Amino acid sequence: PQYTIKLEGAKCIGYRTVSVAGTRDPIMISKIDDIVEGVRARVADNYRDKGYKYNLNFTIYGKNGVMGDLEPVKDAHPHELGIVIEVVADTQEQADTICASARSTMLHYGYEGRRATAGNLAFPFSPSDFHAGRVYVFSMYHIIEVEDPTSLFPIDIVTL
């Protein structure tokens, strides 16, 4: 028979910080895509000279938050949105900094028709940002064909 051994590996790609918020403002909800892009652009501009490598992700629950682009309901009209701001960066400090900037920018982001100037978001947790630790991705997936499935795993029995 042909034996195979599966090898898998993961590597750390950075550190994650998350902020969870919500909004019920119908004007903000109607403009959420433009607001997210505006926040993303402002954060990128603010940190352009720092040399940070990061990934800033917004998941909007109530509007494609679960299925993303595969969502079949294209013109939903939710009365509230859950917003998860997620940052993965090279260090925890950088992830914290970018997440805080994105959260604060979105909280006070100006948009046409805005009425509330005290803040656009509600936060279920205080503090609003929290560490989610190291982030890993698969870095190796390999199948080895061997004649003897035990040859790579020697066993030594020692009697004490």
Model-derived regions, located:
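C-terminal non-catalytic interaction/assembly regions of soluble proteins
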Residues: Q2-L160
